[in-house]
Every structure is written in structure tokens, then in C-alpha cells.
Amino acid sequence: MLDIQLLRTQLDTVAARLAARGYTLDTEAFTALENERKALQTRTQDLQARRNSLSKQVGEAKRRGEDASAVLAEVSGLGDELKANEAALEGLQGRLAELLQAIPNLPHESVPVGRDETGNVEIRRVGVPRSFDFQVKDHVDIGTPLGLDAETGAKLSGARFTVLRGQMARLHRALAQFMLNTHADEHGYTEVYTPYMVNATSMYGTGQLPKFEEDLFRVPRGDENFYLVPTAEVPVTNFVRDEIVKAADLPLRYVAHTPCFRSEAGAYGRDTRGMIRQHQFDKVELVQVVRPEESLNALETLTGHAETILKKLGLPYRVIVLCTGDMGFGSQKTYDIEVWLPAQDTYREISSCSSMGDFQARRMQARFKDEAGKNQLVHTLNGSGLAVGRTLVAVLENYQNADGSVTVPEVLRPYMGGLEKLLPQG
């Protein structure tokens, strides 16, 4: 959430920066609400001052033994008006809060301006796509004889669910363990295990609610709604909600492996085949909580940590910086990492790494105490390190062999009991 003081003092500038990301700020509505708020506050302050003055007059009249009934009647009337004004002011504050909650984050000045994904800018490519001397298959055709079972997934749960059996399930587990170990042992992240359901307050804190409720799976329980996590970013970032962190404890680095649940409400007809877009998928998530002046450097570092996984796996990839029109709601700056998929002859997203600035921290009231003893908002970052299912897809396609087997990348073999190849079953 943006600082309302920024809108009050730099409304036109904020509107222009938001326009660069395709969001039209209703400046007239905001100005009207602000003018109404100011008028109400001024009137309320005047009434309070008048009531205080009259109360003194009542006290003086009583000390002199004079009749104060007329003044008391006026005080009573002022009290009624004050209550009405306070109720109106509370309603106005609620409307201002609703307006603020719908406003996306301001893009950092280093973000390229663009209307949509066509405005994204490639930063670097790493690795050379393999040349095959046979007809490449996609991950479904490769994976089905190896234990990828979309049919049973559909029987159990419907479209966009998959069952993995035997060596495929083991490869999936190996990837997650490899990612966790790399980030915890080499990059200094603290591994955490979190709930897979969170309350609405947590979803609000990281920006999923109220704007993106249709993308979530809601679990009603009595009078309260819980939500299946769309990413471990939600529970992990909320660790610092309503907390004041010691400056000496920053930066905080957490890594978590969770299933993620998304309705894919806006993805009808896209990636319906295979594991690219699922309602349930696993992801290893990286979260950092840092001082404000460190957030952009931390984004470069976090992105590099995600890239390390692809480098160790020997998978070709590229990094792009998202333009203003393609950024996520709460993002200040985002790098997408895209892995090469031979069957699609293109790069596909496997990680998104973002600095959120103080956008989430303001919603969560997540602060740290600086050296001067002043409480300041922290900055938060998150990124996939990596999406496990899509990494499995990339391994299958990039390491496939003509006989239908798949070579296991060397770094995964210790997690696979030394297995060097996945072989078709039956």
C-alpha cells in the first residue's frame, strides 16, 4: 500500500508514475474525499474547542452559583454533532482506505516503461540450448512412460492436476531437496516450514486481498475464511507482520518449500496440456526482509540465488526485467527468469524475483528500529528458487534421449540414490 502522504503532497507525480504501468488513478475522487476529510476534521476540531470553552464556562458559572442550563444544553448539542462528525470521518477514512488498497505499487525509476510483456527487456542469456539429432518430445510425451499420470490426476481432482509415480515422484522430491539445500547451505537462508492455509489478514498483508480473491482457493470455517497459500511468500513474509525487528537482525533470509494453490481464473484455454500451469504445484520460495537502502542490491542477489539452481542443473535460461505494464500489483521491480524448453522452442518463466519496497510492510506494519531509535518500515523481497514442477519439465525436455530415457543431472544423483537415467516403465 502506498503512503497516503505521498498522494497528498505529490498527487500528479504519483498519477503519472502509475499511468506508466497502465493504472489510472482517480485523482478527482481522491481529491474530493480529501477535501471532505479536511472539512470534517476542521469542523470537528472547532466543535471540540467550542465544547472545551463552554465546559469551562459551566464550571465558572457553577462556582458563582449562576444558572448554567443554557450553556449545558449547547454542550449537549455539540456532543451530538461531534459524534455524528466522528462517525462520518470514520466512514471517509474507510473509503480512502479502499481507494488506497486498490492502487498498485510505484515502479522504480530503473524499470523500463512499456505497455505489456512486449516491453520487457532481456538482461542476459546463460547457457546454449542443446542441439538434438532426433525429434524432441514435450514433457508429457516423455514423462508419461516414466510415471507422469495426468489421467489419474484428472480423475481425482479434475483439470490441471497431476499424479507423479515412482521415479518421477522421486525426481520431483530430489529437485525440491536440492533447491532447499543449496539456498540454506550456500546462500545463507533459514529453512522454514509454514502452514498451507492462512487467514485473510495474512493475504491482505502481502497484497493478495482484496484485489485478487478470485485467484485464491477459499476455505470457510465457521465465521472465518482461510485461504490455501498461492505461494510461500504469503506466510513467510507475514512472519514480520506487526513486528519491530532489531536493525542488527537484518537482513532476514528465509526459504520454504510448499505446495501452491491457484485458481488460474484468467488462464482459461492456456497451457492446458501437462504441468506448466496447474491448480496445485510445488515451489521453493525465497524471502528477504531488508533495510530500505539495501532492497535493490538485495534483488540482484536474490535473483542470482535463483539462477544458481539453473546453472547447477545445466539448464539454459535468460533473465528479463519486466516493464511497467507487465509488473505484479505489489512489485517495485521484477526480474523474470525463463528456462529453455526445447519442445516449445522458447523460454518459459520458471521464477519471478521482486522487490516490493515498503508496499507490503506498510500493510503489515512491519518495521525495524534504526540506530537513532526510530521505527522505520522494512523492505520485503521474494522470488521463486525455483518452481519445482516447471524445473522438472525443463529437466525432462533438456535431458531427454532418443530411446525415451532421461539423463539425471549430476547434481541430482545423490538425491536419487545414484540413479543416472530415468527409464520408461513397462
From Swiss-Prot:
Which pathway or pathways does this protein act in? Aminoacyl-tRNA biosynthesis; selenocysteinyl-tRNA(Sec) biosynthesis; L-seryl-tRNA(Sec) from L-serine and tRNA(Sec): step 1/1
Q: Residues that bind L-serine, according to the entry?
A: T231, A232, E233, E285, S384
Q: Mind telling me which InterPro entries this protein's record contains?
A: aa-tRNA-synt_IIb, aa-tRNA-synth_II, aa-tRNA-synth_II/BPL/LPL, Ser-tRNA-ligase_type_1, Ser-tRNA-synth_1_N, SerRS_1_N_sf, SerRS_core, tRNA-bd_arm
A single GO BP term for this record reads: seryl-tRNA aminoacylation
Which GO terms fall under molecular function for this chain's record?
A: ATP binding; serine-tRNA ligase activity
Catalysed reaction, written as an equation:
tRNA(Ser) + L-serine + ATP = L-seryl-tRNA(Ser) + AMP + diphosphate + H(+); tRNA(Sec) + L-serine + ATP = L-seryl-tRNA(Sec) + AMP + diphosphate + H(+)
* A GO-annotated cellular component: cytoplasm
Q: Gene3D superfamilies of this UniProt entry?
A: Bira Bifunctional Protein, Domain 2, Serine-tRNA synthetase, tRNA binding domain
Known EC number = 6.1.1.11
- Function field: Catalyzes the attachment of serine to tRNA(Ser). Is also able to aminoacylate tRNA(Sec) with serine, to form the misacylated tRNA L-seryl-tRNA(Sec), which will be further converted into selenocysteinyl-tRNA(Sec).
**Protein name per its UniProtKB record:** Serine--tRNA ligase
Gene name tied to this protein: serS
